């Protein structure tokens, strides 16, 4: 936990799009990226600057999406988590109709050297603080999906208070693999 105290946990700013892109590309180079992300390094690297500029600007506005980062004293970003709102009646990433106003946690990444330091806890605390502070609509839960083979991540989510909902879906880019939905209810 001592490492975490050296980091500033905060939302991204619109002008930080290059760091948003850099951290995402680093995350997609991680050995477990194929379990944790639906996008490949090659797909992300091919996206134009405008994509990253829009992503950073949207997250900085914090209306329907937020990206929380862990910034080291030297300015390096050591982790990130993103959250977006899923409104009732919209379609989720699987094409299913959303039946409850909720948040969806995605893009969880902490650099290998910082794992176990408390950064993931700090990122999730800030992300869920953003979720629970939302007033319109008030969100009753947050959810995320975890690959069936990503036990380290699943263990963290359970320890943090998420519970398996029982919903199991095929991984969009590999239907032979399964992803489990985990949810946490508003305190």
Summary of predicted features, one role per range:
Residues 22-113, 124-126, 130-136, 185-187:
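Acetyl-CoA-dependent GNAT
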Residues 8-22, 34:
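A short beta-loop-alpha structural element at the N-terminal edge
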